């Protein structure tokens, strides 16, 4: 019998996964595990549960994607038992044993291909037209403060139309995740407005529904372990909860800001002290503490001068 492997997630990482909003924007300090434990589960879930789909990973440059984003994703997947060359391949045509994507890429050079036919295309803004002709079912936008929003809006967001006939029932079809630390310029602040789009009551209802599903499953497990019959009404109640959760997630926007201190258990106090010592006050406040400082139109912080 295979033993389940326990995986540690901090509170921001757990909440992001449990809420599972169709649009998720996480603004968090350095070393909070944005790529490793927020982006990696998001991409893996989409590729596993929408077999044959195509997703997009938007990065400022291919160099950034290949040296920062991609290694973080692959390292997390490896820890969770997904092996490069067995469960997925990168940058080459997948083996014949893999299922084929619903829409096959023209070129596999910047593509992650999964065994079930899902693939993720690395979309770099330093190469014009890298979103052209794509039909995407999800988008991951990494290092969003360096992303040109006009290019994203004109070239990439329209591609996130997905294939409704295959994946329309999933709340995460057309989903988008945006990750960054706190920007220091007006141009890099394009994603902060998502805070105003979030409905706190809807998010609270999702949290309550997730808990109620867990509580109901525990009750069913308890009855089964005692070899007692599980009432039909309880099974029906669980199905209704799942349907309601799926509907709420499909329209939800989740926006959160976190400082690096949220990951203190792994980072340790010395890391925070070292960053305070080594970074400029402005960079420490934005990149570690994730604090918003008023940004003037010229791109400089209006309430602070270094």
Predicted regions and their residues:
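Pre-Walker A adenine-sensing motif
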Residues: 2-21
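Conserved P-loop
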Residues: 24-93
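Catalytic P-loop NTPase motifs of RecA-like helicase/translocase cores
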Residues: 32-33, 65, 131, 147-150, ...
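Alpha-helical scaffold elements adjacent to nucleotide-binding pockets in ATP/GTP-utilizing enzyme cores
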Residues: 41, 68-76, 151-159, 190-194, ...
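Conserved nucleotide-binding/hydrolysis micro-motifs of P-loop NTPases
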Residues: 62-64, 127, 182-186, 262-265
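Inter-Walker segment of RecA-like/P-loop motor cores
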Residues: 66-135
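Signature of the SF2 helicase/ATPase Hel1-core->accessory helical subdomain module
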Residues: 141-250, 257-260
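ATPase catalytic-site recognition across NTP-hydrolyzing enzymes
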Residues: 225-239, 247-251, 257-306
């Amino acid at each position: 019998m295979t033993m389940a492997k326990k995986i540690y997630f901090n509170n921001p990482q757990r909440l992001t996964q449990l809420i599972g909003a169709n649009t998720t924007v996480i603004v968090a300090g350095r070393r909070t595990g944005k790529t490793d434990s927020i982006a990696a589960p998001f991409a893996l879930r989409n590729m596993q549960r929408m077999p044959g789909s195509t997703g997009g990973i938007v990065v400022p440059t291919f160099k950034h994607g290949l040296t920062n984003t991609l290694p973080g994703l692959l390292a997390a997947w490896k820890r969770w038992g997904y092996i490069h060359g067995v469960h997925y391949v990168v940058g080459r045509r997948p083996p014949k044993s893999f299922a084929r994507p619903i829409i096959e890429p023209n070129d596999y050079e910047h593509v992650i291909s999964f065994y079930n036919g899902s693939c993720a295309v690395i979309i770099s803004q330093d190469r014009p037209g890298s979103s052209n002709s794509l039909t995407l079912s999800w988008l991951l936008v990494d290092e969003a403060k360096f992303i040109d929003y006009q290019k994203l809006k004109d070239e990439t967001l329209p591609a996130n139309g997905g294939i409704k006939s295959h994946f329309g029932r999933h709340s995460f079809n057309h989903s988008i995740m945006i990750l960054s630390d706190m920007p220091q310029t007006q141009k890099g602040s394009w994603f902060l407005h998502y805070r105003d789009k979030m409905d706190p009551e809807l998010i609270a209802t999702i949290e309550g529904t997730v808990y109620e599903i867990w509580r109901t499953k525990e009750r069913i497990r308890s009855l089964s372990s005692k070899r007692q019959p599980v009432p039909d009404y309880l099974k029906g109640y669980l199905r209704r909860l799942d349907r309601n959760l799926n509907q709420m997630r499909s329209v939800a926007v989740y926006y959160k800001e976190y400082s690096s201190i949220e990951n203190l258990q792994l980072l340790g106090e010395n890391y925070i002290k070292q960053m305070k010592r080594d970074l400029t006050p402005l960079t420490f406040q934005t990149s570690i503490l994730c604090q918003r400082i008023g940004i003037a139109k010229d791109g400089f912080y209006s309430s602070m001068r270094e």
